[in-house]
Curated annotation (Swiss-Prot):
InterPro entries: Ald_DH/histidinol_DH, Ald_DH_C, Ald_DH_N, Aldehyde_DH_dom, G-glutamylP_reductase_CS, Glu-5-SA_DH, GPR_dom. This is Gamma-glutamyl phosphate reductase. It comes from the Bacteria. Transmembrane segments: none annotated. It comes from Cupriavidus taiwanensis (strain DSM 17343 / BCRC 17206 / CCUG 44338 / CIP 107171 / LMG 19424 / R1). Keywords: Amino-acid biosynthesis, Cytoplasm, NADP, Oxidoreductase, Proline biosynthesis. PANTHER family: DELTA-1-PYRROLINE-5-CARBOXYLATE SYNTHASE (PTHR11063:SF8), GLUTAMATE SEMIALDEHYDE DEHYDROGENASE (PTHR11063). GO terms for biological process: L-proline biosynthetic process. The gene is proA. PROSITE patterns: PROA (PS01223). Pathway: Amino-acid biosynthesis; L-proline biosynthesis; L-glutamate 5-semialdehyde from L-glutamate: step 2/2. It is found in: Cytoplasm. It is an enzyme of class 1 (oxidoreductase).
Length: 426
């Protein structure tokens, strides 16, 4: 596809999305739910065909030398297909935020002022190898009254196109424009460059991908972004922590799963409790095969307790998202240093304190500058489902617009509504 043809194609997609966004914005909850449930039924009906199409993507990925983890993310198994269908049904069951009016106030002039929740408009979503994101993103955008343009990874092009056809079927069955959800059908990388600069058609970009993708988009995008960067999550064991809670929470925060962005990557421990807290916890980590990268004070504490096989932490380790069985551990003087370390080295994602001291806990959640801050709970709870939001499009580290898990409300905005009785301003 020439540059001229690509620009024409992307402009057509953008115009269609903008036109469809107006219809989706005024669609009834019943029609949106009907579309979601029809898509779910179509996915179950065509499961075998979806697996056959996906198998071609998987075969191509293997031939291109992609590793096992990549192939696993790409594969549409029976479980993955069932999960997609169930997810659509769950989103259909969620309350519709669109049109909700809140914060109504009577003014001395006689008018009433409130805020109404409305769609953002057209959302561009850029993602990599997971074809299930096609359905998750389409469903969240549809329920929140937005049109969406989806740009998945080239490795999943056949799977994404097949899923998009089922989405179009569901939209049409509910009397909604099929152009409300469009998958970019070219694998040309220049399509991403055009999508992120189409300010006339696209209201916001939501990228889901690795560091290099996000970095490129931050440099080149003209459309505003809701982005998800690293998940460098911390747990701080305070001097007044309950040791049983500390061991249980810190074990779960690191070892329940290694790949999610809400997994703990750095453990901070008060020097006043390090000798009691570190040995039982690190014994569990070593039994589970977790590599421990430690500061000098932590090394001294653990070696005195008979530990070996420790790795010296470098300055870089405090800034790394491992997504692997590796944990950085630092012994700190106390709460002041813990908060300072998190705000300097963290990614503003999710951080937790283990303490029985109310004042310490409240100070931690006030002063740590992260999207989610916790007291006596695992960072693994930083999730839209666990927060009662239902499905999520991602977890935003940003401070503007959506922050933390981005569910239906995160894909909307508020406009002011005023009710009067003929009042005029004097």
């Amino acid at each position: 596809m020439t540059e001229f043809d690509l620009n024409q194609y992307m402009d057509r997609v953008g115009r269609q999305a903008r036109a469809a966004s107006r219809a989706i914005a005024r669609a009834s909850t019943a029609d949106k739910n009907r579309a979601l449930l029809t898509i779910a039924a179509a996915i179950r009906r065509d499961a075998d065909q979806l697996k056959a199409v996906n198998a071609r993507d998987v075969e191509r990925a293997r031939a291109n030398g992609q590793d096992a983890a990549f192939v696993d993310r790409l594969t549409l198994s029976d479980k993955a297909i069932a999960t997609m269908a169930a997810g659509l049904e769950q989103i259909a069951a969620l309350p519709d935020p669109i049109g909700e009016i809140s914060n109504m106030k009577f003014r001395p002039t006689g008018i009433q002022v409130g805020q109404m929740r409305v769609p953002l408009g057209v959302i561009g979503i850029i993602y990599e190898s997971r074809p299930n994101v096609t359905i998750d993103a389409a469903a969240l955008c549809l329920k929140s009254g937005n049109a969406t343009i989806l740009r998945g990874g080239s490795e999943a092009i056949e799977s994404n196109t097949a899923l998009a056809a089922l989405v179009a079927e569901g939209l049409s069955a509910a009397g909604l424009p099929p152009e409300a959800v469009q998958v970019i059908e070219t694998t040309d990388r220049a399509a991403v460059g055009r999508l992120i600069t189409m300010t006339e058609f696209v209201d916001v970009i939501v990228p889901r991908g690795g560091k290099s993708l996000i970095a490129r988009l931050m440099e080149e995008a003209r459309v505003p972004m809701i982005k998800h960067l690293d998940g460098i999550c911390h747990v701080y064991i305070d001097a007044e922590a309950d040791l049983d809670k500390a061991v249980r929470v810190c074990d779960n925060a690191k070892t329940q799963r290694y790949a999610p962005c809400n997994t703990m990557e750095t453990l901070l421990v008060s020097q006043d409790i390090a000798a009691a807290a570190l040995p039982p916890l690190c014994r569990i980590y070593q039994q589970k095969g977790v590599e421990l990268r430690v500061c000098p004070a932590t090394r001294a504490t653990l070696e005195a307790a008979g530990f070996s096989g420790l790795v010296d932490a470098s300055e870089e380790d405090w800034r790394l998202e491992y997504l692997a069985p590796i944990l950085a551990i630092k012994t700190v003087v106390g709460l002041d240093q813990a908060i300072s370390h998190i705000n300097e080295y963290g990614s503003h994602h999710t951080d937790s304190i283990i303490t029985e001291n109310y004042s310490a806990g409240m100070r931690f959640i006030r002063e740590v500058d992260s999207a989610s801050v916790m007291i006596n709970a695992s960072t693994r709870f930083a999730d839209g489902f666990e927060y009662g939001l239902g499905a999520e499009i991602g977890i935003s580290n940003d401070k503007l617009h959506a922050r933390g898990p981005v569910g239906l409300e995160g894909l909307t905005s508020l406009k002011y509504v005023v009710f009067g009785h003929g009042e005029v301003r004097t």
